[in-house]
């Protein structure tokens, strides 16, 4: 396993922002292996559907084989003819064609995406969770400083 360069890959997902912290990714590929539909590809870091608000893949599909379900962009395989227009429209390169379109469905039937559960470093996460953790850490630091200051008198 290798450590890759550190940067954030961000994409807006309706109300939330999905974050892949590439600097935290250790290249273990658990996210890729755990995906039940093989919707994550790995090329130095995980590439997965960001379930864009504007979802260009949905509008590019002439067969209406892509739908938004539970705020996730999902391929309906029975409708897909494998034309590849969705893959061309995807700004993240997260769709591949293997007879039909294959992409992350955001584990739309689950509360938490499997890739997020299995990631040992938390490299795949929601920005909201990351910010809440940072805020809590900052509050804890200020509380410690206040305690030290108050007890120094």
UniProtKB/Swiss-Prot annotation:
[4Fe-4S] cluster 3 binds at residues 49, 52, 57, 90. [4Fe-4S] cluster 2 binds at residues 35, 104, 107, 115. Residues 16-45, 40-71, 71-100, 95-129 form the 4Fe-4S ferredoxin-type domain. The lineage of its organism: Archaea, Methanobacteriati, Methanobacteriota, Methanomada group, Methanococci. It comes from Methanocaldococcus jannaschii (strain ATCC 43067 / DSM 2661 / JAL-1 / JCM 10045 / NBRC 100440) (Methanococcus jannaschii). Binds 4 [4Fe-4S] clusters. [4Fe-4S] cluster 1 binds at residues 25, 28, 31, 119. It holds the Pfam family Fer4_11. InterPro entries: 4Fe4S_Fe-S-bd, 4Fe4S_Fe_S_CS, RnfB_subfamily. The keyword Acyltransferase does not apply. This is Uncharacterized protein MJ0264. Its cofactor is [4Fe-4S] cluster. GO terms for molecular function: 4 iron, 4 sulfur cluster binding; metal ion binding; oxidoreductase activity.
């Amino acid at each position: 396993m290798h450590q890759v360069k550190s940067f954030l890959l961000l994409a807006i997902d309706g109300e939330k922002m999905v974050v892949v912290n590439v600097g935290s990714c250790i290249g273990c590929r658990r996210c890729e292996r755990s995906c039940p539909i093989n919707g994550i590809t790995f090329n130095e870091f995980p590439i997965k559907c960001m379930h864009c608000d504007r979802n260009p893949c949905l509008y590019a599909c002439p067969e209406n084989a892509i739908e938004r379900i539970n705020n996730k962009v999902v391929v309906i395989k029975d409708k897909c003819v494998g034309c590849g227009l969705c893959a061309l429209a995807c700004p993240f390169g997260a769709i591949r064609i293997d007879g039909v379109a294959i992409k992350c469905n955001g584990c739309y039937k689950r509360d938490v995406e499997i890739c997020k559960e299995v990631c040992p470093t938390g490299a795949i996460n929601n920005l909201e969770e990351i910010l809440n953790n940072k805020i809590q850490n900052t509050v804890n630091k200020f509380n410690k400083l206040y305690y030290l200051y108050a007890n120094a008198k």
